């Protein structure tokens, strides 16, 4: 994509989520979560969605996972506006390596998203990505506190789209606290930027997450 045609845009978004996890065994787990996201400097609702995920450890520290996302997206641009219904599914491979209080973790994810109720001939070309993420985690001893630093690269693979290839990256810094009999609360800051695209949008992300897990074994 030529830079002479590129549009530079920037924004600040707010992301929040509540998640419930079910640990069926020491290898198999499920989770359900509700998400709410705002854009336009956290002044306009962007989307809300329900996500269901599962993960299975096939051998020590190596997991296979999958999930689905039911999305309501706020379209407030153009002649036809309103809430759109989108659906996304994903498959992923996760690996982590513990070094005392440090953890190295890696993820390879395939995701596919499209708007429901439309055909491809109606410009409903699915968004398909391969996502490559690596990170470093640190746990403070006997405190429940931890830090994570993550970097992710997005590779768009839908053949009909002229913006195919590596075209986005995201950096995230996260701090979390685990509370006994209450769950885990996380605060994070992310920076995301497009490249090799017509719309060179960049955004800052301020987020909060809460998760409570039940052990069934």
Label every model-predicted segment:
Residues 1-12, 214-216:
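Bacterial Sec-dependent N-terminal signal peptides
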Residues 7-67, 71-74:
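Start-of-domain marker
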Residues 12-14, 46-48, 85-89, 124-130, ...:
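Residues that define the transmembrane beta-barrel architecture of outer-membrane proteins
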Residues 18-22, 52-56, 91-95, 110, ...:
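Residues on the lipid-exposed face of transmembrane beta-strands in outer-membrane beta-barrel proteins
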Residues 26-32, 61-66, 100-104, 142-147, ...:
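Repeated loop/turn-to-beta-strand initiation elements of outer-membrane beta-barrel proteins
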Residues 34-40, 68-74, 97-99, 110-114, ...:
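Transmembrane beta-strands of outer-membrane beta-barrel pores
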Residues 103, 107-184, 190-192:
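Outer-membrane beta-barrel transmembrane domain signature
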Residues 174-217:
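Long hydrophobic alpha-helical segments typical of transmembrane helices together
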């Amino acid at each position: 994509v030529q830079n002479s045609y590129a549009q530079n845009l920037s924004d600040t978004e707010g992301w929040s989520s509540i998640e419930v996890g079910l640990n069926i065994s020491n290898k198999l787990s499920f989770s359900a979560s509700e998400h709410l996201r705002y854009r336009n400097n956290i002044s306009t609702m962007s989307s809300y969605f329900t996500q269901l995920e599962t993960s299975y450890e096939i051998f020590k520290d190596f997991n296979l996972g999958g999930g689905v996302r039911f999305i309501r997206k706020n379209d407030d641009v153009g002649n036809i506006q309103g809430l759109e219904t989108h659906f996304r599914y994903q498959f992923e491979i996760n690996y982590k390596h513990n070094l005392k209080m440090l953890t190295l973790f890696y993820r390879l994810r395939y995701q596919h998203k499209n708007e429901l109720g439309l055909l491809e001939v109606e410009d409903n070309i699915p968004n398909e990505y391969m996502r490559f993420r690596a990170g470093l985690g640190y746990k403070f001893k006997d405190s429940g506190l931890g830090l994570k630093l993550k970097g992710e690269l997005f590779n768009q693979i839908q053949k009909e789209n002229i913006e195919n290839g590596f075209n986005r990256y995201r950096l995230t810094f996260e701090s979390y606290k685990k509370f006994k009999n209450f769950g885990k609360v996380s605060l994070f800051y992310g920076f995301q930027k497009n490249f090799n695209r017509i719309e060179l949008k960049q955004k800052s992300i301020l987020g909060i997450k809460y998760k409570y897990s039940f052990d069934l074994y």
